[in-house]
UniProtKB/Swiss-Prot annotation:
The gene is INSIG2. It is found in: Endoplasmic reticulum membrane. Binds oxysterols in a pocket within their transmembrane domains and interacts with SCAP via transmembrane domains 3 and 4. Belongs to the INSIG family. There is a cross-link at C215 (Glycyl cysteine thioester (Cys-Gly) (interchain with G-Cter in ubiquitin)). Residues 1-28, 89-103, 149-153, 208-225 are cytoplasmic. This is Insulin-induced gene 2 protein. Oxysterol-binding protein that mediates feedback control of cholesterol synthesis by controlling both endoplasmic reticulum to Golgi transport of SCAP and degradation of HMGCR. Acts as a negative regulator of cholesterol biosynthesis by mediating the retention of the SCAP-SREBP complex in the endoplasmic reticulum, thereby blocking the processing of sterol regulatory element-binding proteins (SREBPs) SREBF1/SREBP1 and SREBF2/SREBP2. The modification Cysteine sulfenic acid (-SOH) is found at C215. Pfam families: INSIG.
């Protein structure tokens, strides 16, 4: 009788593994949405900076009207930002290469500020030739990685992102999907890979910080249970 009473049915609860998987999938979606909107916002901000140089990747009226011919560019940047931001912490876990620095949102915000500054420099500074511009922006981009990342996976992924994004952008231009407003096409190609590299490092840092915050919340919940 005692055994029957102890085995009396009650409301069954999900095991810790199932609840953990569910919460992780929800948090993954939340992180993806946050990264998407951050990417869209940065795309619009950086485009405003490039308008000063008249070399925008999409026409200025894309901000004023959603029916612009290049309305799809900010959502594409947001999607790429979400993928990059989710990919960085995933690769860190698989490679077992934790970040070397104590992560804080203040460091992430400084990284974003430096990235915007690099883009602003590409729009404002005048150089004698495109090689000087490329070398300067490359040094600034590598400096951003060294200051806020320093991981081999981050550098490799940043280089891969820069190469792939530059190739895709040039293919879109060659196929007439959209075109640069600057007549100096070589000038655009001289800074584009560096901007993509710095952008990949920046979104990777944001994604890592969001993932770290998620792990901290899950650990606190499991500790309370």
């Amino acid at each position: 009788m005692v055994e029957e009473e102890t085995e009396s049915p009650g409301p069954k609860k999900c095991g810790p593994y199932i609840s953990s998987v569910t919460s992780q999938s929800v948090n993954l979606m939340i992180r993806g949405v946050v990264l998407f909107f951050i990417g869209v916002f940065l795309a619009l901000v950086l485009n405003l900076l490039q308008i000063q140089r008249n070399v925008t990747l999409f026409p200025p009226d894309v901000i004023a009207s959603i029916f612009s011919s290049a309305w799809w560019v900010p959502p594409c940047c947001g999607t790429a930002s979400a993928v990059i931001g989710l990919l960085y912490p995933c690769i860190d876990r698989h490679l077992g290469e934790p970040h070397k620095f104590n992560r804080e949102w203040s460091n992430v915000m400084r990284c974003v500020a430096v990235f915007v500054g690099i883009n602003h420099a590409s729009a404002k500074l005048d150089f004698d030739n495109n090689i000087q511009l490329s070398l300067t922006l490359a040094a600034l981009s590598v400096g951003l990685w060294w200051t806020f990342d320093r991981s081999r996976s981050g550098f490799g992924l940043g280089v891969g992102i820069a190469f792939l994004a530059t190739v895709v952008t040039q293919l879109l231009v060659y196929n007439g999907v959209y075109q640069y407003t600057s007549p100096d096409f070589l000038y655009v190609r001289s800074w584009l890979p560096c901007i993509f590299f710095a952008g990949g490092i920046t979104m990777g840092n944001i994604g890592r910080q969001l993932a770290m915050y998620e792990c901290k919340v899950i650990a606190e919940k499991s500790h309370q249970e």
